[in-house]
Amino acid sequence: MSGFQMPQANFKAGFVRENFNKIAKKYDRFNDWNSFLLHRVWKNHLVREIENNFSGHLHVLDLCCGTGDISLRLENSSFVDHVTCVDFSENMLEIAKTRLKKQAQKGRVHFELGDATKLIQFQNSQFDVVSIGFGLRNVDNLSKAIGEIFRVLKPGGMFLNLDVGKVKNPWIRWIADFYFFKIVPILGYILWGGKNEMFDYLPVSSLSYPDQETLQLILEKEGFQRVQYKNFVFGNVVLHVAKKPSEKT
């Protein structure tokens, strides 16, 4: 395992924001390298899951949107009318704005600098769908973030969360951990041109993040129903899908 020590909870948000700002320009290439381009497949699957559950005209909140990789896929979907992109890294959000400039000019995309645990700029029941890609484990208060997601979703709306998972098979887990904790940081150093603690943080942050079943229980505790998940690459990555209950008639 890496010798990197996670920042204390009250310093985590500042650490994450500062360091994502630093690596923003290299982040997409880093994802390509460390996932062998598979992150693109997983993100496409997230969008297809939305399309399989709705008829169209969707207003989507892409939370922790980063450089807009999922936002772009959502905007390209004929099922989506509007995407609101939120991140608390200014530099990440600037890249998303550049990437989606034409779509924003058409009024199909909107950008907000914001914190996933304090979505005060949004009304209750405002969005049909909320998506997060590899961002939930970076928040400093998981329960608060999920509570906010639940609040801004319309009744019957859907939350989709793509992030790291836990591999159950011990032999595969050993290989996965070796790659994630030893090789992935080195790939980051090569890309960065030197050592950078953010590339150590990314794998270490997975240690305190809930496994598939635990996150499912947390989502249900916060009020979500029909919570399911799909594993990719033996559970190294997982997509959770959860529904907010419809209003009683």
From Swiss-Prot:
Q: Which UniProt keywords apply?
A: Menaquinone biosynthesis, Methyltransferase, S-adenosyl-L-methionine, Transferase
**Which domain of life does this protein belong to?**
Bacteria
Keyword rRNA-binding among record annotations:
no
Task: Report the EC code(s) recorded for this entry.
Answer: 2.1.1.163
Q: Which reaction does it catalyse?
A: a 2-demethylmenaquinol + S-adenosyl-L-methionine = a menaquinol + S-adenosyl-L-homocysteine + H(+)
InterPro entries on file:
SAM-dependent_MTases_sf (IPR029063), UbiE/COQ5_MeTrFase (IPR004033), UbiE/COQ5_MeTrFase_CS (IPR023576)
Q: In which pathway does it act?
A: Quinol/quinone metabolism; menaquinone biosynthesis; menaquinol from 1,4-dihydroxy-2-naphthoate: step 2/2
Keyword ATP-binding annotated:
no
Instruction: Write out the residues that bind S-adenosyl-L-methionine.
Output: 67, 87, 115-116
The record's top EC class is transferase
Any coiled-coil ranges, and where? none
- Matching PROSITE patterns: SAM_MT_UBIE (PS51608), UBIE_1 (PS01183), UBIE_2 (PS01184)
GO biological process, any: methylation
Q: Which GO terms describe its molecular function?
A: demethylmenaquinone methyltransferase activity; methyltransferase activity
Q: Which Pfam families match?
A: Ubie_methyltran
Entry-linked PANTHER family = 2-METHOXY-6-POLYPRENYL-1,4-BENZOQUINOL METHYLASE, MITOCHONDRIAL (PTHR43591:SF24), METHYLTRANSFERASE (PTHR43591)
Family according to the record? Belongs to the class I-like SAM-binding methyltransferase superfamily. MenG/UbiE family.
- Record's function text: Methyltransferase required for the conversion of demethylmenaquinol (DMKH2) to menaquinol (MKH2).
**The name this protein goes by in its record:** Demethylmenaquinone methyltransferase
Q: Tell me the gene name.
A: menG
